[in-house]
Amino acid sequence: MLLLRAIRSMMPKEERIIEQFVEQARHIVTASEALEAVMVAEPDERGERTAALKRIEKDADRVAKEAGRGLHRTFITPFDRSEIQALINALDDCIDLMDEVPRHAALYGIDSFDTPMRRMAGIIRRQAALLTEVMPLLTSITANAD
């Protein structure tokens, strides 16, 4: 019993990986709202709103890097290590892609976003909201498998 306690005390503690997924999901929601704001903005307001989206992306990158470092320090993970890394990357990619929209629009000379593009941004926002609902379910992944 004493030996088991000693071994456990030396093992790395589980990092807050799931909490970081939840935090990333919240960043995705915020980024999707910022993307919508960019799309409805007048051209003279677009720079400020694009900068806000960039700030969200930078903060989300910080969380993704922390999650990656935490994964490498963790001995026992809540589920497969490669799946955790893939999820970290996928969540980060969501925000990175949203962040690229204003830059690519400017590159291709798109001055305004038409209704279908704005609708697509709304779909992205609604899907992002779903992420904030499902990420906490990862804390009890086996109970929620069905």
Where would I find each of the regions flagged by the language model?
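Cytosolic, long alpha-helical scaffolding segments
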Residues: 1-146
